[in-house]
Amino acid sequence: NVVTGKRYIKKLVMDGIVDGWDDPRLVSIAALRRRGFTPESIKMFVELCGVSKAQSSVCYDMLEYCIREDLKLKRPRMMAVLDPVKLIIDNYPEEQMEELEIENNLPFGRELYINRDDFMENPPRKYFRLFPGNEVRLMGAYFVTCTGCEKDEAGNVTAVHCTYDPETKCGSGFTGRKVKGTIHWVAAKTAFRAQVRLYENIIDEEKGVYNEDGSLNLNPNSLTVLDDCYLEPALKEAKAYDSYQFVRTGFFCADCRDSKPGAPVFNRIVSLKSSFKLPKPEDCSKTL
């Protein structure tokens, strides 16, 4: 369920729950545009909905399906680490930096950032990413083997250590070796820090749309702001409404209101995957 009534939206704006009529959690045209929805995706959604004389509901997932289908073949794939932890390659030359022969010629060095959930000290079964003794592929770069980690006084991992095999550059030199895990990364020296915003439905569907007093039952986690994300250098030039696929994460758009030259702010448009398969409207659990 999403909020479409003007009376409810006005109250959300007046109470400061959303930052305006174009807040990306809403479904006005201005809000969808700010979030990164394209005209083609909205047209596709309208065509799939069709016209019905009877009262009916439409899957909200269908709207996300349309934008995902429109963007997946159009937008460049970029490296972005949203929950970073440092990865130190102990046997890589300390001052050396190289440009890999991959998209955007991404810089590579001794210290990288990887996603925090790409390392576990005591992993469960079928976890194929970094853990002590395991080898993984750094996307577009080398194979690395985890040797350990550093922790702070609270027991939180502050850095992960590994060694690399120089013969495996860009996917070569590993005949006979099976590496199941591939993770993305950015170089610590060249990546820039940026804010990324993750959006969910503004209505808490598990508790119902309305409270007993008739007010909306709002989702307290409808907006998550990540201030310590590290992105590849090319994304620094992003302008308002520019959209990209962040590898293994989702599709993101530079915010038209808060982005500044050299300091973009990114809104998540939609995640990469969904189980949605164009069901009949009456079978949907989420309605628009």
Question: Residue ranges of each PLM-predicted region?
Answer:
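Catalytic adenosine-cofactor/nucleotide-binding cores of aminoacyl-tRNA synthetases and other
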Residues: N1-L288
